[in-house]
């Protein structure tokens, strides 16, 4: 591509360079990376759409940069007048260009982080974004800290590590707003950029990489960013599973090798046993039916079979490599006898359909004989799952397949033992050990599927049963009566109902789900989670339904407490459950409880939710200890701060003491999956962070808060909840204001997830799901649900006694939980901009509601000031120049998209809004005989004026990418 250097075009570089704060060090290549990607992109844009369009992008960027300098509302209006003068086709191209530039800025940032990590100039434990995290929980560092600072012996560390489990639960929450087709192209752009800056690159390599970089940037820009149909749960499952294929499958053994190395460095010569459950994976995709009518029993069945087929395929693809390696002839007697037996029973022509080792394997290669048999079984296991998935039945006999994990591990363990006993331990600890570790981690099911259902749906089923049996209405019984009946049925043997039970569609759906659980292998499933659980009968009901539907190995039942009142009542509910003898005997000393971050935040605001979650965990652990039960907390965190997100290791280290105890389950949601597992190095970093932080929390628990800190926070939480609820639930016109001032009503058009955005189609804020609630406020850069309530709470305690300010500063310095809470809010303020929110108000909100918006913005400014006072900071993010720089580099792009979104919403909602269009500026559109049509025709069914809907969706995606948050 001609290397045009138009005078005008140099200015984006200039702006970028001016934005860099002086403090950022020499090793920082971010601006260089950013400028390179941008230059390439603008060249491509000019080639495709002409110089005029490139100049318009430039002009918009400059207006935005000027606004970022002084925050004058006039600048936003100038931006608006340029944007509204564009014709529909150009408008789509511009929105797409800015969205694309933000994605490129994110990629530049990721490459820069990897570069800085390599040159070891990392400060440990800063507070920043998850994705950029210079926040580290490095295993080597953690081990050194535990041995050096805490005098833990290497043996104690090894013991704790062998017995700890982190279970990462992938959920397809509708927050992954980037299409998979684009994610793959982004990965290749990242690779090209990293290689371009490698030390030993030749001129030819450089030229080829540069061409590849341009090709990938153009391919990404030419891909439709918008999903034209909503994904089904099966699509979500396949998208989630693709991460296993791409990074997790190979990432786990690689990570466990690094654990071995780190242990060796502190003097432990043993390796982590291959069956130590250090990392486990579960999934909600296709199992989470809470409020999602599209997740049917058939979907659950399909998803389990698909995962089994994928697991068998990945093992099968690896087994031949292992056979190549295992060419040894020395073996112990046990293996020799088995190999002879397998050889005698094998058919000569049985292996014709394999590429390698297709003839009968001689007994002089005993390991290959054994592994050949494993290969046959894997082949049949895969075929059977494939046939069951395709047509519901299979002609592959079950005995030709692997039925359970023990059966799969047994021949591999035999090979391992034999190699060790013949002096070939180093060989055993090679690929065979990696394979054993994969089998132990992924099993035959790849992931274990959790089932989640609302407690009301179980009540409906039991009510139908008791009504049918003429013993009354279960729904109307008291909790005592319910428990008494459930326990008498659980202790008895008779079946409760037959095929004559009258069933509505909903009841059949619940019962059929239990039948699917009974039909499929037990290792396909993890937990049965009950949302909106409040009482012991909710848990006993699921136990009874599992028994009635003949589930041979019942799933563990996990109550989920989400709303503030439910969290407060959770310890008492769990204590009542443990006091039921039947249940206590059933659980074998182990119980899991899930706590929800999203709904509690929507219900009471971030401060009260965070504090209540902290207290509920402390209380739950006390209750469990009292009854001699080991409790696992399952954290339902979202990606955004409003939904419990934030850097992993800080989140773990700020949990109350004693609440993790080497066993942690946590959801990895939506776009966080891509940030955690999108690349090999990200996957490694994620596994390392979770493992190191869980170990550190157990061996070096955070301090318990002082009684006076608790009392202060209790008082603050009451004030914060009062203010939050007085605005969100009690202000009569709030819902109207929210719907006008944000793109909430238009959110559903993004086709991100398979779940409806509301629990009930009518209804106000209560029925809105937490994700669109947060999404809408994130889009306007106002982030209301995150900070609302903090300001009045801090102001209240300082006005009451000025010494409380010192106490708050003391809490910030010495109490990890409080520090993390305040730091997260500070980061959100750094991403916020009330000036942008004011533009939405001016354009979209009716005039009589303007004072309401002004009041909220004044509250934003006051809260920001008080948060800085509490942290002892003069300026937002003053302790983290890197994050500050990165946010400033993104702001000008995001501002253009915000203004574009606000004016587009105005035109969608008010068709009579007058705009003066200028002629086409895109060369591609102007020179085409069908002007602007092509882009607009991608969305032929839009009910709005041409191009508006696509422009709106592109701005939503761009802003989400820029803030690195969707919902």
Swiss-Prot record:
The enzyme's E.C. designation: 4.1.1.31
Subcellular locations according to the entry: Cytoplasm
PTM section of the record: The phosphorylation of Ser-11 is reversibly promoted by inorganic phosphate (Pi) deprivation. Enhanced activity by phosphorylation at pH 7.3 by lowering Km and sensitivity to inhibition by L-malate and L-aspartate, while enhancing activation by glucose 6-phosphate.
Gene3D superfamilies tied to this protein: Phosphoenolpyruvate/pyruvate domain (1.20.1440.90)
Predominant cellular place of this UniProt entry's protein: cytoplasm
Residues annotated with Phosphoserine modification: 11, 704
Activity's dependence on pH: Optimum pH is 8-9.
Cofactor(s) of this protein: Mg(2+); Mn(2+)
Active site: 173, 602
Lineage: superkingdom: Eukaryota
Annotated tissue distribution: Expressed in all plant organs, with higher levels in roots.
A GO CC term attached to the entry: cytosol
Description of how activity is regulated: By light-reversible phosphorylation. Activated by inorganic phosphate (Pi) deprivation and glucose 6-phosphate. Inhibited by L-malate and L-aspartate.
Assembly information from the UniProt record: Homotetramer.
NCBIfam families xref list: PRK00009.1
Family: Belongs to the PEPCase type 1 family.
Protein name (database record): Phosphoenolpyruvate carboxylase 1
Native organism: Arabidopsis thaliana (Mouse-ear cress)
Primary gene name: PPC1
């Amino acid at each position: 591509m001609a290397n045009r250097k138009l005078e005008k075009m140099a200015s984006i570089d200039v702006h970028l360079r001016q934005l860099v704060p002086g403090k950022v060090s020499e090793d920082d290549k971010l601006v260089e990376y950013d400028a390179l990607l941008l230059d390439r992109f603008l060249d491509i844009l000019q080639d495709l759409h002409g110089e005029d369009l490139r100049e318009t992008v430039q002009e918009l960027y400059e207006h935005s940069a000027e606004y970022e300098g002084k925050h004058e509302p006039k600048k936003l209006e100038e931006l608006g007048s340029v944007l509204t003068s564009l014709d529909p086709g150009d408008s789509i191209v511009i929105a797409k260009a800015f969205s694309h530039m933000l994605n490129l800025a994110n990629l530049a940032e990721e490459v820069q982080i990897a570069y800085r990590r390599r040159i070891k100039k990392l400060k440990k434990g800063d507070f920043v974004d998850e994705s950029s995290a210079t926040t580290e929980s490095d295993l080597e560092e953690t081990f050194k800290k535990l041995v050096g600072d805490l005098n833990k012996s290497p043996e104690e560390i090894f013991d704790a590590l062998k017995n700890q489990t982190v279970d990462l639960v992938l959920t397809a929450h509708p927050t992954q707003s980037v299409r998979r087709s684009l994610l793959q192209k982004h990965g290749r752009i990242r690779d090209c950029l990293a290689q371009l800056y490698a030390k030993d690159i030749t001129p030819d390599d450089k030229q080829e990489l540069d061409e590849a970089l341009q090709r990938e940037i153009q391919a990404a820009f030419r891909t439709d960013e918008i999903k034209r149909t909503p994904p089904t749960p099966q699509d979500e499952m396949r998208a989630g599973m693709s991460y296993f294929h791409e990074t997790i499958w190979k990432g786990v053994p690689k990570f466990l090798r690094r654990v071995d190395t780190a242990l060796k460095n502190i003097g432990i010569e043993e390796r982590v046993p291959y069956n130590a459950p250090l990392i486990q994976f579960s999934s909600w995709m296709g199992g989470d039916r809470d409020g999602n009518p599209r997740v049917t029993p058939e979907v659950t069945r399909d998803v389990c079979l698909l995962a089994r087929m994928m697991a068998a395929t990945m093992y099968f693809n690896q087994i031949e490599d292992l056979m190549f390696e295992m060419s040894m002839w020395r073996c112990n007697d046990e293996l020799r006898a088995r190999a002879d037996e397998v050889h005698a029973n094998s058919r000569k022509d049985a292996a014709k359909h394999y590429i390698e080792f297709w003839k009968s394997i001689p007994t002089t290669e005993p390991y290959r004989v054994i592994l050949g048999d494993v290969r046959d079984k894997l082949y049949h296991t895969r075929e059977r799952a494939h046939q069951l998935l395709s047509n519901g039945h299979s002609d592959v006999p079950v005995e030709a397949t692997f039925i359970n994990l023990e059966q799969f591990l047994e021949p591999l363990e035999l090979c391992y033992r034999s190699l060790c006993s013949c002096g070939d331990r180093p060989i055993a600890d090679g690929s065979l050990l990696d394979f054993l570790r994969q089998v132990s981690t992924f099993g035959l099911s790849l992931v274990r599927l959790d089932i989640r259902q609302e407690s009301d749906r179980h009540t409906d089923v039991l009510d139908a049963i008791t009504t049918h049996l003429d013993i009354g209405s279960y729904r109307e019984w008291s909790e005592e009566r319910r428990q008494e009946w459930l326990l008498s049925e659980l202790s008895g043997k008779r079946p409760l109902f037959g095929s004559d039970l009258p069933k509505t569609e909903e009841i059949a759906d619940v019962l059929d789900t239990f039948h699917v659980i009974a039909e499929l292998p037990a290792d396909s499933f993890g937990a049965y989670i009950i949302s909106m659980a409040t009482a012991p009968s909710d848990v006993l009901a699921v136990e009874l339904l599992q028994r009635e539907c003949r589930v041979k190995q019942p799933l563990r039942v996990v109550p989920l407490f989400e709303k503030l009142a439910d969290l407060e009542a959770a310890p008492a509910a769990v204590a009542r459950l443990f006091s039921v003898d039947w249940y206590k005997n059933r659980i074998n000393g182990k119980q899991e409880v899930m706590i929800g971050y999203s709904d509690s935040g929507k219900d009471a605001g971030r401060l009260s939710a965070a504090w209540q979650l902290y207290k509920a965990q402390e209380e739950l652990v006390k209750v469990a200890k009292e009854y001699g039960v080991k409790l696992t907390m399952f954290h339902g965190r979202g990606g955004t701060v409003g939904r419990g997100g934030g850097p992993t290791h800080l989140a773990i280290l700020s949990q109350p003491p004693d609440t993790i105890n080497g066993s942690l389950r946590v959801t990895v949601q939506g776009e966080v999956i891509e940030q955690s597992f999108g690349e090999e190095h990200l996957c490694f970093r994620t596994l390392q962070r979770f493992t190191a932080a869980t170990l550190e929390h157990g061996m070096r628990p955070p301090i318990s808060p002082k009684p006076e800190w608790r009392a202060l926070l209790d008082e603050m939480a009451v004030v914060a909840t009062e203010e939050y609820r007085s605005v969100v639930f009690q202000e009569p016109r709030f819902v109207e204001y929210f719907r006008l001032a944000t793109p909430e009503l238009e959110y559903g058009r993004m086709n991100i997830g398979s779940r409806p955005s509301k629990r009930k189609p009518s209804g106000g804020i209560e029925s809105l799901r937490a994700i669109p609630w947060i999404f809408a406020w994130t889009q306007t850069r106002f982030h209301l649900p995150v900070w609302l309530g903090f300001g009045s709470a801090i102001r209240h305690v300082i006005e009451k006694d000025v010494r409380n300010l010192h106490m708050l500063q003391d809490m910030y310095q010495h109490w990890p939980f409080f520090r993390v809470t305040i730091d997260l809010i500070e980061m959100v303020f750094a991403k916020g901009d009330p000036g942008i929110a004011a533009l939405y108000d001016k354009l979209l909100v009716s005039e009589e509601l303007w004072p309401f918006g002004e009041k909220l913005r004044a509250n934003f400014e006051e809260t920001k000031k008080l948060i800085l006072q509490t942290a002892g900071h003069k300026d937002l993010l003053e302790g983290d120049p890197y994050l500050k720089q990165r946010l400033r580099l993104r702001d000008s792009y995001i501002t253009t998209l915000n203004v574009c979104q606000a004016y587009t919403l105005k035109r969608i909602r008010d068709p009579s809004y007058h705009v003066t269009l200028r002629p086409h500026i895109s060369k591609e559109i102007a020179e085409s005989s069908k002007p602007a049509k092509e882009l607009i025709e991608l969305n032929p069914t839009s009910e709005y004026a041409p191009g508006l809907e696509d422009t709106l969706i592109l701005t939503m995606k761009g802003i989400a990418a820029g803030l690195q948050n969707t919902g």
